[in-house]
């Protein structure tokens, strides 16, 4: 029924819809059927007639490709297992001898267990594929060795499709580097690994079940897993083997059922196109007003309101109704005056039902479900959790038993808050709870409190924020923002200076700490301001909601968060990884300090090899090394990152349909747009004399409404914001009219407050009931506005800025969403959608995204699609590019001619580009979509898990930007696999050479793992509340000389008040002061220089791009401290654990420069002590470095 309504509405708007999945499948089928066609000039020659060639069937080809990919990963994982075994053998390590849990799990035990399990699964998968192949072509199971010969015959006999040689452009700053020529040809090995790893690294059965929320990453790992105890009087922990098998089969059955339910509930996305586009106007027409002014319809009620208002011209926003404001006030007062807020708190009917469950449970001595190790989950909580949420609670308990933290990276709207609160409540129920702290955006403070009282009413919740204490707070927040766009800093910061009254929060903190169920909720800004108080407390748990806020390892808020005194740290984020490996390191260094070592070592041993391996001119050794380093890194981090998608779990979500509407520019918009493109400002942008963001901002304002350019001078004009001058507003007017008649309720998002002003005037003029929330909305009113909209059917529209409130804002009262203008960052648009389409939504959701055809907005949308193609299901939310290349800039500042009858939207070309990209990875087609209908591709989160992974190749021959290469190299495993096998075939044709390269790559990966182990060892000597050394900030894990230089300065904002040196007591060292010693700057320059030198050398001399263990092969010059200390340690170990000064000096004479002499001494003293006997003196390694 609703689909018919949508079709009728879209027909009235002059647009048509199409199913993107059908279109994509059609294009892929065409590309598969005609693999020998020329597409877009990317292939130079068509394939010749294949006579006398016995080609395998498509199914056999597919199985062969998968088999080859599995074999390649088996080799990589096997080397990791062997490496861990060697380290364990050298140290004589036995699992039973490990008494310190932290030391055990930060060592090699878990990595070895995971790698062994993965190896077992891969071998099982290999046998299965070989059996399938045997059944296909009638060979015996023992003939699997012939598959390699068959593949070589295929490669040999099948004519190769040659591409143009692409010359890598020589950067101006690297004039001395030699130019390499790379030939891109279709190759069976290239296709094999691409097809076999289209979803990332080869997905094992464990990986699939974890992704679908059925198992935890620690399933069946002895010493790590904490299973549900079986009900019954015995309540035994160790189940018989038969029960284990039955459990496995039941898990598989649940997985199949879950997959089928998820497939049925999977939402669809539709592609839309505007018809009857207006003809092109003359190049530059002067901006003009409409002769007919847009005024509010005259009615008796309106006239009465005007007379009542008198001369009052200031427009005030509508406030939530009195009953909703009173509700928030009662919540604040009740929780401040009572330790048990659940008896006083006003609740909704569903919340009252929850409290009744707890009251009944009190009378019956609450029943519970027990996990191994003693965690009791109250039955009233357990039965209300979805299966994947129960797995999440189990995973949190497994981390707790390891005294480690983790990242809950579930997709937005899957209930991360519920999982955390259920776990904390279970800890309290099991008598294991200590007062904990939750840090979140300011808009979510009351939502956290309400959810805590709903899911576990025994919590004593306190909010440390002025908005929850002072009724008058927020009155001074009405000043206009200097920025046109709401940002993270402007939307969710507290906008307040540090309070002069340092004892203001003492009583509140005492109430939390003195309560056995104390739970403190505060914001990131308050944590920074009140660091003296909050950082001196030993918390049970520290939870960061929207934890991607600490992705910058050197920012103040990151360093403050990392000083919280607890080993139990949880990050909640719907966008777990952004762009760089550095951001990955920062998040993991919070939840598991030292897991990835110190940042300089991590960058030198992992980031640089992975980055170099992603370059277009990387050698086979470099590419193979990058892959093996990525394998090591994956096994380190995956158990501590839980990421489930809506498409993979049975989340009981309603259907969601998303439309992308391409709107046409009005006459005024087009003339203004063309006038700007012809202006001197654009010329200055091209010349580099003006910031490009200025021009982009102007064009985006024109797309929204041309009046925004004259806001300061014309906002009082009665005709300001006339919807007839905006193509998108004309569409909004028609859509809202129909939705109002159909009884739907709407969320209307825009990025800017200025555009919200125009939309608000439009809503007032049409007498629509509405509410508004943006960065200037007082914090105390935000929850009341949300409550009113979710519970009052009278509210028709809620207008918001895209970023206000963060990812966790729940607006399920709406079932229609309009995203007025797209964001560079696709996650911002996604989070706007997720406000309505999440757990708790009872109706089907329809989303309209408005994009102005042929303008900057379509290019923004195009780049959103590009980002979705470049990322896999773990890295779902990359940021936009921070800069543009010259050709990108010129591409942005154009307007497509709408007068061309054959013109199409830029987005419609994505499909033809998709087919071209498919050709690059092995299948070819020059057949385009049969119609010239303009198409818009919107890759939603649930849809992209099914999308065909496509390797995006730079057509101009230049390497992609560094961030993209990192993503493709580490997690987009088909990119890694493809590069590995392609280069191996092109540059190393014989098996002996391949084996030699793999051996060398394995050695480099082993050295990287060893460097990380040593770095972790250094880091573990410091308290968990001391920030890890990043090369610029922190001191934990840094060499002693660096620690003296970098650790001597503390953050003045944390220590400038107070009488006692509490900050020094906690080891606070959040950043550098402006008066640092020159030697620190020199050290930083040397680190930067050596890192750049390592990359540069890796490009031209791949086989010497990584530090060798022998001194003779090392380069003379300055070395990174972490590299030098490893060399010293290795040398002394080779000498039996002790060496005299003369031998040490002679060995390092050619390695250490004169400027590094003092650094060398300090590093030597760090790992060894000088001992003397009657005849001589010698350096002896300290005990922790002997093995």
From Swiss-Prot:
What would be one Gene Ontology cellular-component term for the protein?
Answer: nucleus
Binding of ATP: at which residues? 410-417
- Gene3D superfamilies for this protein: P-loop containing nucleotide triphosphate hydrolases, Tandem AAA-ATPase domain
The recorded induction information for this protein reads:
Accumulates after genotoxic agents treatment such as bleomycin (BLM), a small peptide that create DNA double strand breaks (DSBs).
Biased region (Basic and acidic residues) positions are: 23-48, 492-501
Q: Known Pfam families for this protein?
A: Helicase_C, SNF2-rel_dom
Motif interval(s): Nuclear localization signal 1? 162-169
Q: Which protein, by its recorded name, is this?
A: Protein CHROMATIN REMODELING 8
Q: Which organism is it from?
A: Arabidopsis thaliana
Question: What gene, per UniProt, encodes this protein?
Answer: CHR8
């Amino acid at each position: 029924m609703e689909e018919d309504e949508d079709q009728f509405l879209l027909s009235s708007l002059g647009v048509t819809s199409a199913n993107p999945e059908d279109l994509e499948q059609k294009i892929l089928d065409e590309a598969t059927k005609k693999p020998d066609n020329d597409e877009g000039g990317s292939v130079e020659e068509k394939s010749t007639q294949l006579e006398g060639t016995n080609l395998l069937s498509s199914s056999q080809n597919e199985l062969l490709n998968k088999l080859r990919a599995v074999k390649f990963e088996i080799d990589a994982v096997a080397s990791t297992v062997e490496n861990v075994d060697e380290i364990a053998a050298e140290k004589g390590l036995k699992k039973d001898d490990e008494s310190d849990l932290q030391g055990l799990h930060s060592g090699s035990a878990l990595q070895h267990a995971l790698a062994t399990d993965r190896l077992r699964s891969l071998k099982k998968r290999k046998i299965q594929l070989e059996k399938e192949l045997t059944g296909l072509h009638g060979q015996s199971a023992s003939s699997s060795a012939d598959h390699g010969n068959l593949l070589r015959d295929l490669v040999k006999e099948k004519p190769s499709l040659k591409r143009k040689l692409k010359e890598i452009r020589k950067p101006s700053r690297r004039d001395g580097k030699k130019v390499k020529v790379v030939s891109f040809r279709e190759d069976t090995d290239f296709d094999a690994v691409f097809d076999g790893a289209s979803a990332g690294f080869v997905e094992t059965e464990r990986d699939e079940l974890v992704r679908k929320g059925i198992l935890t990453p620690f399933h069946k790992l002895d010493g790590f897993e904490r299973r549900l105890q079986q009900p019954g009087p015995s309540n035994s922990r160790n189940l018989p083997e038969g029960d284990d098998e039955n459990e496995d089969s039941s898990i598989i059955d649940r997985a199949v059922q879950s997959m089928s339910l998820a497939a049925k509930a999977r939402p669809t996305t539709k592609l839309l196109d505007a018809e009857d586009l207006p003809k092109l106007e003359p190049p530059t027409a002067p901006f003009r007003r409409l002769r007919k002014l847009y005024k509010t319809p005259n009615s008796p009620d309106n006239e009465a309101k005007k007379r009542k208002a008198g001369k009052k011209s200031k427009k005030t926003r509508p406030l939530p109704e009195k009953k909703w404001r009173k509700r928030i006030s009662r919540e604040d007062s009740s929780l401040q005056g009572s330790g048990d807020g659940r008896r006083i708190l006003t609740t909704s009917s569903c919340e009252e039902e929850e409290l009744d469950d707890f009251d009944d449970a009190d009378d019956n001595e609450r029943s519970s479900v027990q996990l191994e190790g003693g965690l009791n989950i109250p039955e009233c909580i357990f039965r209300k959790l979805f299966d994947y949420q129960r797995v999440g609670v189990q995973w949190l308990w497994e981390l707790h038993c390891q005294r480690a933290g983790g990242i809950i990276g579930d997709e937005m709207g899957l209930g991360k808050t519920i999982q955390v609160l259920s776990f904390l409540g279970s800890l309290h129920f099991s008598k294991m709870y200590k007062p904990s702290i939750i840090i979140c955006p300011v808009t979510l403070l009351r939502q956290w409190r309400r959810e805590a009282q709903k899911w576990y009413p025994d919590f004593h919740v306190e909010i440390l924020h002025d908005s929850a204490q002072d009724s008058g707070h927020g009155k001074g927040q009405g000043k206009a923002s200097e920025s046109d766009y709401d940002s993270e800093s402007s939307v969710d910061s507290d906008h307040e200076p540090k309070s002069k009254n340092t004892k203001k929060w003492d009583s509140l903190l005492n109430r939390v700490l003195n309560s056995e169920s104390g739970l403190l909720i505060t914001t990131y800004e308050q944590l920074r301001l009140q660091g003296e108080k909050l950082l001196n407390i030993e918390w049970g748990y520290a939870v960061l909601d929207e934890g991607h806020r600490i992705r910058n390892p050197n920012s103040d808020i990151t360093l403050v968060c990392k000083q919280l005194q607890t080993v139990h740290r949880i990050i909640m984020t719907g966008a777990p990884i952004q762009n760089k490996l550095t951001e990955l390191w920062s998040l993991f260094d919070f939840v598991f300090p030292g897991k990835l070592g110190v940042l300089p070592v991590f960058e030198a041993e992992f980031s640089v090899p992975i980055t170099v391996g992603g370059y277009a001119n990387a050698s086979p050794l470099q590419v193979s090394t990058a892959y093996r380093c990525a394998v090591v890194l994956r096994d380190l981090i995956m158990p501590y990152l839980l990421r489930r998608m809506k498409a993979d779990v049975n989340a009981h979500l309603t259907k969601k349909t998303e439309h992308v509407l391409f709107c046409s520019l009005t006459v005024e918009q087009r003339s203004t747009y063309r006038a700007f493109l012809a202006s001197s400002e654009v010329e200055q942008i091209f010349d580099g004399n003006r910031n490009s963001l200025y021009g982009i901002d102007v064009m985006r304002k024109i797309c929204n409404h041309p009046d925004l350019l004259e806001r300061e001078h014309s906002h009082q004009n009665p005709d300001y914001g006339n919807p007839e001058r905006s193509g998108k507003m004309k569409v909004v007017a028609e859509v809202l009219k129909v939705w109002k008649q159909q009884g739907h309720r709407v969320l209307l998002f825009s990025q800017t407050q200025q555009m919200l002003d125009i939309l608000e005037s439009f809503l007032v003029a049409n007498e629509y009931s509405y509410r508004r929330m943006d960065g200037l909305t007082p914090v105390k009113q935000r929850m009341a506005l949300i409550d009113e909209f979710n519970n009052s059917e009278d509210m028709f529209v809620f207008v918001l800025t895209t970023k206000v409130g963060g990812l966790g804002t729940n607006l399920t009262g709406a079932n229609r969403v309009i995203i007025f203008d797209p964001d560079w960052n696709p996650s911002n648009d996604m989070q706007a959608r997720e406000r309505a389409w999440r757990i708790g939504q009872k109706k089907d959701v329809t989303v309209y995204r408005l994009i102005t055809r042929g303008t900057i907005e379509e290019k923004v949308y195009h780049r959103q699609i590009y980002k979705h193609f470049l990322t896999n299901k773990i890295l779902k939310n990359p940021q936009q590019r921070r800069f543009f290349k010259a050709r990108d800039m010129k591409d942005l500042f154009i307007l497509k001619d709408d007068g061309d009858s054959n013109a199409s939207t830029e987005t419609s070309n994505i499909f033809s580009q998709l087919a071209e990209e498919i050709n690059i990875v092995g299948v070819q087609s020059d057949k385009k979509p049969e119609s010239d209908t303009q198409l818009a591709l919107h890759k939603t989160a649930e849809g992209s898990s099914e999308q065909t992974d496509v390797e995006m190749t730079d057509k101009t021959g230049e390497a992609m930007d560094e961030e993209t290469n990192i993503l493709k190299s580490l997690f987009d495993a088909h990119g890694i696999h493809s590069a590995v096998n392609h280069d191996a075939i092109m540059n190393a044709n014989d098996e002996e050479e391949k084996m030699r390269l793999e051996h060398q790559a394995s050695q480099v990966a082993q050295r990287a793992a060893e460097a990380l182990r040593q770095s972790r060892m250094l880091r573990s000597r410091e308290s968990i509340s001391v920030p890890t050394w990043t090369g610029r900030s922190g001191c934990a894990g840094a060499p002693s000389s660096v620690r003296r230089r970098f650790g001597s300065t503390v953050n003045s904002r944390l220590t400038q008040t107070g009488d006692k040196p509490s900050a020094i007591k906690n080891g606070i060292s959040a950043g550098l002061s402006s008066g640092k010693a020159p030697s620190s700057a020199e050290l930083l320059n040397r680190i930067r220089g050596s890192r750049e030198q390592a990359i540069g050398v890796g490009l031209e001399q791949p086989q010497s791009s990584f530090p060798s263990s022998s001194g003779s092969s090392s380069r003379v010059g300055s070395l990174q401290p972490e590299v030098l200390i490893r060399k010293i340690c290795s040398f002394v170990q080779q000498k039996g654990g002790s060496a005299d000064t003369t031998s040490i000096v002679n060995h390092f004479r050619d390695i250490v420069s004169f400027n590094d002499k003092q650094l060398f001494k300090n590093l030597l003293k760090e790992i060894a002590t000088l001992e003397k006997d009657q005849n001589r003196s010698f350096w002896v390694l300290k005990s922790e470095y002997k093995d």
